[in-house]
């Protein structure tokens, strides 16, 4: 799935359903990015962020050839050559890194045969967060952190929101259509929640510093309530209003 990170959320725009186990291959990933470029333009790509499974020689080379900045996490046991030309696990280049310490490696490292900049952040319990990129950027970890928004999206599509997995659909065509409906519903719910938070009732911040309810859940609860009124009470004014706020003429409503 390819998503755009915007205002703390990931907006799903393109996806491929895989009739296989595991992750997408390089051809499938490139097809998604090409589709984005064809519709929105390459200049709209600020950075591509991805997890550890999305690496490879052809993939990295294609991103470089098309001048697409990337910040991609890599596995700590990935084999690389150290300064002496010896093959080691990449974590050995950062063996003395302390928790909370951030280091940008001094030279490019060949990853799958392609030179990349590598940055490392020491985490708790001797873990490492390793990010490969094709440009030097002091904010590489800030960029990579936005990848978490797609995990939030998945949780909204699944247990926290639409229970996508509980449909038990197996036919790819039906799953594809359902995912499209869920993507639209997610955007609608989030937009309604945003609209309410900004114009009607700002969130209360609890003692632990978190909002009392997520923007998505606020919008979803509002949509559910409106649909119940429409179907059970034949009262459609609220759902009609929620449809109207999808337009750009928000100020004229109310």
Feature locations, PLM:
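Single, function-defining residue in the core of a domain
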Residues: 4-254
């Amino acid at each position: 799935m390819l998503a755009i990170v915007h205002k703390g959320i990931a907006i799903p725009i393109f996806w491929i359903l895989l009739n296989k186990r595991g992750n997408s291959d390089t051809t499938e990933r490139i097809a998604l990015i090409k589709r984005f470029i064809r519709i929105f333009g390459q200049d709209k790509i600020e950075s591509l962020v991805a997890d550890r499974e999305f690496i490879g020689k052809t993939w990295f080379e294609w991103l470089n050839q098309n001048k697409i900045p990337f910040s991609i996490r890599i596995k700590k046991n990935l084999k690389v050559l150290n300064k002496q030309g010896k093959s080691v696990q990449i974590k050995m280049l950062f063996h003395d890194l302390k928790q909370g310490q951030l280091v940008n490696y001094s030279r490019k490292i060949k990853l799958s045969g392609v030179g990349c900049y590598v940055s490392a952040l020491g985490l708790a319990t001797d873990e490492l967060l390793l990010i490969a990129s094709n440009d030097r950027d002091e904010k590489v970890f800030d960029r990579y952190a936005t990848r978490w928004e797609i995990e939030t999206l998945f949780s909204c599509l699944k247990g926290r929101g639409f229970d996508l997995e509980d449909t038990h659909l197996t036919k790819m065509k039906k799953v594809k259509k359902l995912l499209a409906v869920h993507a639209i519903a997610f955007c609608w719910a989030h937009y309604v929640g945003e609209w309410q938070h900004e114009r009607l009732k700002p969130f209360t911040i609890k003692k632990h510093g978190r909002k009392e309810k997520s923007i998505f859940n606020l919008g979803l609860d509002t949509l559910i309530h409106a649909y119940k009124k429409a179907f059970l009470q034949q009262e459609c004014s609220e759902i009609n209003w929620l449809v109207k706020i999808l337009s750009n003429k928000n100020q004229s409503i109310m």
